[in-house]
Curated annotation (Swiss-Prot):
Principal localisation: cytoplasm
Protein name per UniProt: Regulatory protein CysR
General function of this protein: Probably regulates the expression of genes from the sulfate permease complex.
Gene that this polypeptide is encoded by: cysR
CDD domains to which the protein is assigned, alphabetical: HTH_CRP (cd00092)
Species of the source: Synechococcus elongatus (strain ATCC 33912 / PCC 7942 / FACHB-805)
Gene Ontology CC terms: cytoplasm
Domain HTH crp-type: 120-196
Cell wall biogenesis/degradation in keyword set: no
Amino acid sequence: MVREPASTLLPPTSPATPAPHRLLIGRRGMVPTGANVIWKIQSGLVRSSTWGEEGDMISLGLWGPGDLIGRPLSCLDPYELECLTAVEVVAVSDPALESHESLVRSLRYTERLLSITRLRRAEAKLASLLGWIGERFGQPGATGWEIDLRRIPLTHQVIAELSGSTRVTTTRLLGEFRQAGRIHRRDRALIVRYPETLYPPARLSA
């Protein structure tokens, strides 16, 4: 069942605008997925997802400021855009004029995430996913990516759904990663250590 967006509509800049061009949506609200609307994220974190035949949610990606999202960019049905934080989005009338690079970047991020979920070993999937999230949303530190958990609320359930593993397996592996020093918490940040081959790595390019 599709949930209604918990959103606040701001007035359009011009009476000729056919639909609200800007939305403020609360955490756990849903970004509208109208057939012809593409949104550009101004702030916040959005998760795109669909549902399997047995009703299980399938995460498709995480999207942040500068990314383009919306029904025209997906061929899946159902297709949902859930706000993991408070989100501000603006409607893009012509994505080709707005930014061709944003579309290319979105496709590349999705491709990488899908390749991670196809890994067979749960440990490899989780390690690759944490690295992907670090490159995508973290800041490079002295020894690893620093992910601000106030801005990127990574619960065990969210991580499990993104990696395609169960929550029990994800929780167990996260504990093993902590014991091995591969991840650790500092204040409200999660530190994901760089792989030795990427120490220190260059930031992910679009």
